[in-house]
Amino acid sequence: YTLVYTLSLHDALPISLAEVAGCTDTEISTGHVGYGLAPRINACGRLGKPELGVNLLLSSNYEVAQKLAQELDDLNDSRQDMSREMQEEAEALIEQQNLEEKWVLVLASKNWHSGVIGNVASDLNEKYHRPVVLIAIEENNIGKGSARSISGFNIHDALLAQQELLKAFGGHKQAAGLSIVPEEIETLDKKLNQYAKQQLTPSDLVPRKKVDVAVELEQLSFA
């Protein structure tokens, strides 16, 4: 709502942001906001430059807004590149694991950016249909983690049960964040998997499709 309201206030902002998002030849819809405009503003916060988004939202000067919008677009491209590289590395690590034994995927790397791991964790959670914890080990030797879960597994409660291993954590049943020293990551991996096997069954790790209604083939037509 804030973004849409601001778009209505400043002509310079929607034009410049829409230009870099490639949606100037059509009326801006909620889809354009959700998938074109908002991700570019979101990217600056994830990559540690939130002031760019704030300055753009406050700008009423077209040239200034255009410059800021281009910077946001470049940051969004960087975020997408980081996400692809991180997902490739994470999937390579997953290939080395026995998924019959690993009910929770706990992965860590010094190559990852803590502002991007949440998106990658969500993608891996959807692809492998099991709880995922990705940890970016930062220069201060602290791991910043992002967790995503599946239905029936409260990831906040799971982390609460291992809180003695964590420097900090917070979240809710489907998603959480945490801080941890690298030396405790292996133990966290082991403990979370033990906890998951007490809370889940193998069938919980099988993706389910939601069906609105069952119909017979002869009931369908092209009309």
What are these regions (language model features)?
Residues S221-A223:
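Acidic low-complexity segments
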Residues L7-E186, K197-Q198, R208, A214-Q219:
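Hydrophobic helix-and-loop "lid/oligomerization" segment in the mid-to-C-terminal part
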Residues S203-P207:
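Non-catalytic beta/alpha edge segments that cap or flank active sites
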Residues Y1-T6:
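Short, exposed "boundary/linker" segments that immediately precede the start
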Residues L188-L192:
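Short amphipathic C-terminal alpha-helix that caps PH/PH-like domains
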